[in-house]
């Protein structure tokens, strides 16, 4: 029997890189409400006392960038100089320019379905049946831990009133013959007020954050727990570390369980295939696994700038496929339109759906409908995390002729 360990990590919404991601996606969402045809590539940097917003945006929309940036920072929990960063008083610097017309001529077409890719690149999508979310277990649990930290921190009359926004979690899983069997180690570091004693912090974090999340079936006597192992984490957030958009691409995706093409997501409108195609191939891989065609599936797609059709589509099921990989590839080509316009239409991506994805992972989330008011005063219904639907699983299974 083969045995090995695998580790993934996640970070909280208060981590400086995630603060930057959320600001970038908040800007994107605010623009899409007013201008669905906008081209947005918004980058953010946060450091002590300042948020810098830069990038290339072409739009007819007007957004109060300063007010929006401050709101995101305050909503996360950075609302006082006591915690090291105050969204109400920090400086906000706007360095946004327009998207190059050279890119526009490669993307925009008279016929929408001929829309070219906004850049060259390669993207990967992945799914596994080891969790209900079709995500690798280590990253799934890591996300839930930092999500629980924020939930407890923001709770009225919180049992842990000394929690601060910055936090990180890490899970090490033991696999036996390729199947997750036990949690070998748990690491959780959370920013805190200076008055809390380490012993009290460890006990409270175990009870309020770890216990509600960790699957008891995978815990054992040998599971190692490292809670704030340095003994002190008072200075955090943008004071402790400079935060930049797009620096947590492994946290955003599969925790290292699958390959990554290198492109970040936040702040990019869906004409950028770095984002939209990554969402599409997650949708593809998840439906392949949900259909029972494989236990694990990784799909790669690649593009050339200005060209609509993908340059390549490839499938790997790591020996878990119930049908050959080349047959799965043919089914993918038959049932999924992976041209940029096809992806946008298939997943209904031109809506303000992106800020929630900027923390706790872009994948493994539950699709949810919500309504918003567009610039004309009309009510619009959209679906956040539409790429997590498994609405193609049944037809894939039928066409694969699996019983």
UniProtKB/Swiss-Prot annotation:
It is an enzyme of class 2 (transferase). Its cofactor is Mg(2+); K(+). Residues 99-109 are annotated as: Flexible loop. The keyword Disulfide bond does not apply. CDD domains: S-AdoMet_synt. One of its GO terms (molecular function) is ATP binding. L-methionine binds at residues 56, 99, 241, 272. InterPro entries: ADOMET_SYNTHASE_CS, S-AdoMet_synt_C, S-AdoMet_synt_central, S-AdoMet_synt_N, S-AdoMet_synthetase, S-AdoMet_synthetase_sfam. It catalyses: L-methionine + ATP + H2O = S-adenosyl-L-methionine + phosphate + diphosphate. Belongs to the AdoMet synthase family. This is S-adenosylmethionine synthase. It comes from Xylella fastidiosa (strain M12). The lineage of its organism: Bacteria, Pseudomonadati, Pseudomonadota, Gammaproteobacteria, Lysobacterales.
């Amino acid at each position: 029997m083969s045995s090995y360990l695998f580790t993934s990590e996640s970070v909280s919404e208060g981590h400086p890189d995630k603060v930057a991601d959320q600001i970038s996606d908040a800007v994107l969402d605010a623009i899409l409400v007013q201008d669905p045809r906008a081209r947005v590539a918004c980058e953010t940097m946060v450091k002590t006392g300042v948020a810098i917003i830069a990038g290339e945006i072409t739009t007819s929309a007007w957004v109060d960038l300063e007010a929006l940036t401050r709101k995101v920072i305050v909503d996360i929990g950075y609302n006082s100089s006591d915690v090291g960063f105050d969204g109400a008083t920090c400086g906000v610097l706007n360095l946004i320019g327009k998207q190059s017309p050279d890119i526009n001529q490669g993307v925009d077409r008279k016929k929408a379905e001929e829309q070219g890719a906004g850049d060259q690149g390669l993207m990967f999508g992945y799914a596994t049946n080891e969790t209900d979310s079709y995500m690798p277990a280590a990253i799934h649990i890591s996300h839930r831990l930092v999500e629980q930290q924020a939930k407890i921190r923001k709770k009225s009359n919180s049992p842990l009133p000394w929690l601060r926004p910055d936090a990180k979690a890490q899970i090490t899983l033991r696999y036996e013959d390729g199947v997750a069997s036990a949690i070998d180690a748990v690491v959780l570091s959370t920013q805190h007020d200076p008055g809390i004693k380490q012993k009290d912090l460890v006990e409270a974090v175990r009870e309020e954050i770890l216990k509600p999340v960790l699957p008891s079936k995978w815990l054992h006597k040998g599971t190692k727990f490292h809670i704030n192992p340095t003994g002190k984490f008072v200075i955090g957030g943008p004071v402790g570390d400079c935060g930049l958009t797009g620096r947590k691409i492994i946290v955003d995706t599969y925790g290292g369980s699958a390959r990554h093409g290198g492109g970040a997501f936040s702040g990019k409108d869906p004409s950028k295939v770095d984002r939209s195609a990554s969402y599409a191939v997650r949708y593809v891989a998840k439906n392949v696994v949900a259909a029972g065609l494989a236990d694990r599936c990784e799909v790669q797609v690649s593009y050339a700038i200005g060209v609509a059709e993908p340059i390549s589509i490839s499938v790997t099921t790591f020996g878990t496929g119930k049908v050959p990989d080349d047959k799965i590839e043919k089914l993918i080509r038959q049932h999924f339109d992976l041209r940029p316009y096809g992806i946008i239409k298939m997943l209904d991506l031109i809506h303000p759906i992106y800020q929630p994805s900027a923390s706790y992972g872009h994948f493994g989330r539950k699709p949810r409908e919500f309504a918003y008011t567009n610039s004309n005063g009309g009510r619009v219904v959209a679906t956040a995390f539409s790429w997590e639907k498994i609405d193609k699983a049944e037809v894939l299974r039928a066409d694969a002729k699996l019983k």
